[in-house]
Design a protein with these regions (language model features):
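Acidic, small-residue rich beta-repeat scaffolds with periodic aromatic anchors
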Residues: 30-56, 142-206
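Short glycine-/Asp-/Thr-/Trp-enriched loop segments that recur within the blades
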Residues: 102-108, 158-163
Length: 206
């Protein structure tokens, strides 16, 4: 599910190596370039020349969050792992978070993302690029006031989130899903957190 506030799909050009001319055109045409897929054979190194990013604009239009394919492993589509970049509406980069792994098989890609109604928090859930713990959907929270990313699990005593879906109520209260008892994946329960209060509590502990 993609937030309706995606402003546009931008295309990033990737410079081609000098060896490009020696690869058959069919290799590029047949390359898998999206869909969060693992590939049985490596795609050409200079394939997927146009990488698509998703841009999420805050309700007040002041801040943009870009979800970019990390493009680490040739045995996967470029979007198998993600980077998240936060920018002002003027184009200034405020901060970023890289969810890629050294070999492209132990990181995460963004599953769902959304700004809070008050524009103070950007929230996104993720899925493991290597298929590890398929029941787990880590959620990250970006605080515009603090200009930092924090794990939602740190706000709920270290418990995992077991669904990629979440929703907002009020200006910045987030409701996600965790387990009722540790290890019990058959009994899931909703949990709601006031993100502003939770961020302040975490800040005082640091």
């Amino acid at each position: 599910m993609v937030d309706l506030r995606i402003l546009r799909m931008t295309r990033l050009s990737i410079p081609l190596a000098a060896s490009t001319a020696f690869l058959p055109l069919a290799a590029y045409a047949n390359a898998e370039c999206s869909g969060h897929q693992l590939l049985t054979a490596p795609r050409p190194e200079t394939s997927c020349r146009e990488i698509i990013s998703q841009i999420f604009v805050s309700p007040d239009k002041a801040t943009h969050a870009s979800v970019l394919p990390a493009d680490v492993s040739l045995y996967a589509t470029p979007d198998m792992e993600s980077r998240v970049v936060i920018r002002s509406s003027r184009g200034d980069t405020l901060t970023s978070q890289d969810h890629s792994s050294p070999r492209g098989a132990n990181g995460y890609y963004v599953h769902r993302a959304q700004w809070s109604p008050d524009s103070e928090f950007f929230v996104y859930s993720m899925i493991s690029s290597g298929g590890h713990s398929p029941w787990s959907f880590p959620i990250m929270v970006y605080s515009r006031k603090k200009n930092l990313f924090v794990k939602f699990s740190d706000m709920i005593g270290g418990a995992p989130t077991v669904s990629g879906d979440f929703q907002f109520s009020g200006p910045h209260t987030l409701t996600a899903t965790t387990w009722k008892q540790p290890g019990d994946l058959d009994n899931k329960v909703p949990i709601s957190v006031d993100l502003e209060q939770a961020i302040e509590k975490l800040a005082t502990k640091q």
